[in-house]
Amino acid sequence: MGKKQKENEAYGNSAKYDPSFRGPIKNRGCTDIICCVLFLVFILGYIVVGLVAWVYGDPRQVLYPRNSTGAYCGVGDNKDKPYVLYFNILSCAAAINVISIAENGLQCPTPQVCVSSCPQTPWVVEGFQLSNTVGDVYKEYRNFCVPAVSPDMVVMDSLQKGLCPSFLLPSTPALGRCFPLPNINFTLPEQLQINNTTVSKGISGLLDSINARDVSVKIFEDFAQSWYWILVALGVALVLSLLFILLLRLVAAPLVLLLIVGVLAVLAYGIYHCWQQYRELRDQGVSITQLGFTANLSAYQNVKETWLAALIILAVLEGVLLLMLIFLRQRIRIAIALLKEASRAVGQMMSTMFYPLVTFVLLVICIGYWAVTALYLATSGQPQYVYWVHNTSTPGCEKVLVNVSCDPMAPLNSSCPELKCTFTGYSSSGLAQRSLFNLQIYGILGLFWTVNWVLALGQCVLAGAFASFYWAFHKPRDIPTFPLSSAFIRTLRYHTGSLAFGALILTLVQIARVILEYIDHKLRGSQNPVARCIICCFKCCLWCLEKFIKFLNRNAYIMIAIYGKNFCVSAKNAFMLLMRNVVRVVVLDKVTDLLLFFGKLLVVGGVGVLSFFFFSGRIKGLGKDFKNPDLNYYWLPIMTSIMGAYVIASGFFSVFGMCVDTLFLCFLEDLERNDGSQERPYYMPKALLKILGKKNEVPTGGKNRKK
């Protein structure tokens, strides 16, 4: 006893009885004011970054294609002309890929015009037509010439000045551009030095994007056909998640016992299987000394030492679990009782189950704001125009300086007939552009900090609501009328700074992990094993640190919700309280994890199986109203339903997990504060009192306050 008391003293003294304490303290003050001010100033700066991005950014360069003058196709004056036609796409096809299409607008050294539709038939200017006028030759193809070209201009002049195309190829629109189709059964004049082979080679890289578009259309069609049934599947997931949590008060004990026995049975079968494999390979198998080290991991399946090592590991795990069942059965019973009480708390405050919707909306706002800001920052800059000549050997164009900046609105006073002022891209100069990297870093920091703050807000609000349930002596009579909304207002009013403090600590660790992941990605091709090993060790350490900080923050927010102290004091008190009851913490954590994992498996697996049999048409006789839709890819709505079910189950079970953690801390505080006397009665339910062998004294001449 003396040794245990000394260990407890090392982690602080037990909580003292406070006659005025009746659950979450209402008379509290603002905490971590400096962090609150810092967070608000940072948010103001984040808004300023968004305004700068809005002023200087132009996302149209990603969303819409541009012609040679830099005008956007599909908007403004070109609203009815959504596609770009390249007079000679082969001059830039070799440098085209999907990324450059999106980022650079596919600016190539060839004239580009906005068109209402892409060419459908092949066509070429014949030699005898060069002396005719544009109005006569391009009668049916004026849409493919520069709008400003005069119909009285000679065709030869229009070709030299790059005002009209010399040939047209059957094309298909993709990503807002007209890309030639492959296998064209058409022979072009030899002077153009273009043939079908050249066309096929030049645009082969673009066909992937065209095929991707066809796939995207099919995917859209599948969603249009199956969206209703996907919503039905998500509704089933919601009902299953809610039923699982509400039924835990009835089936928690047998379910936990069944899961533990199931784990023991799986380990026992693993031991048996490893023994069988080891016995077969003991006399005729290859030993580890004979095989040595090899990168072919499948080769180790025929090594007897592999199965022997697996057998030993599984046997140790089996033994540890059996010893835990024998010596920690009392703590397992406490964990089961807390799970039942958590189910009861959720049933009393059903509004808490839908709080994840608030968190989801706030996360969408945070992520959406960052994404829009990052897009506008990436597309900031003034348009740049340079002089360009189609053929510098043309008389009068030999001495023209190309790639020199110009003004597209100024008249071209030059002896070169082919001289153009062409759009090339956006500048990287200017205050916003020079600070682009720093602004993007600021935005990433803002993303992590705001997301972690929103998650912290949800945890603290739920903790306040569930704490008010536990510390209500007569349930449900003493539970506040609106526990969730009261906790929400209380948290925002007093503890924004504390949440920002905890979120900032977690953000810094996550940013460090991102930097390490980036360095590891850069070193992936490196042959230096020492550097790779060091990076791997740092990544492992930061992963463990992040997990620990998340655990500490979660319990700190519970203490903040109950007592209204600042972050550091709350984190210290929570840590000391948990360390004084470390065995109970481990048992409850593992039992809860096992139960929630089974719940997720049940919900996601059930929805997945039902979706598979329905969308694949394996369920017959459902009637006309329940006929499965005709789909191109039936796995698409199945995967969507499974992922949606996982998100819904995670949202519901995260609330339940927070409830268990909150009730557990309140239970530990209850044990330390109270002794069951009339002056200091326990607040825990009768099931926990019975397990612990404790009881509340009955007042003389009256009934026990405890129901």
From Swiss-Prot:
**Reported tissue expression:** Highly expressed in intestine, kidney and stomach. Also expressed in testis and lung.
Which Pfam families does the annotation name? Choline_transpo
The name of this protein is Choline transporter-like protein 4
GO molecular function per UniProt? antiporter activity; choline transmembrane transporter activity; thiamine pyrophosphate transmembrane transporter activity
Primary localization class, coarse: membrane
Cytoplasmic side: which ranges? 1-32, 249-250, 329-356, 474-498, 579-594, 657-707
Could you tell me which species this protein originates from? Rattus norvegicus (Rat)
Gene responsible for this protein: Slc44a4
GO BP terms: namely: acetylcholine biosynthetic process; acetylcholine secretion; choline transport; neuromast hair cell development; otolith formation; positive regulation of cell growth; thiamine pyrophosphate transmembrane transport
Q: Where are the transmembrane segments?
A: 33-53, 228-248, 251-271, 308-328, 357-377, 453-473, 499-519, 558-578, 595-615, 636-656
Q: How is it modified after translation?
A: N-glycosylated; N-glycosylation of Asn-67 and Asn-391 is required for a proper thiamine pyrophosphate uptake.
Residue ranges, Extracellular side:
54-227, 272-307, 378-452, 520-557, 616-635
The family assignment reads:
Belongs to the CTL (choline transporter-like) family.
Membrane protein topology class? Multi-pass membrane protein
The protein's matches in InterPro entries, at most eight in alphabetical order, are given as: Choline_transptr-like
One GO CC term of this entry? Answer: plasma membrane
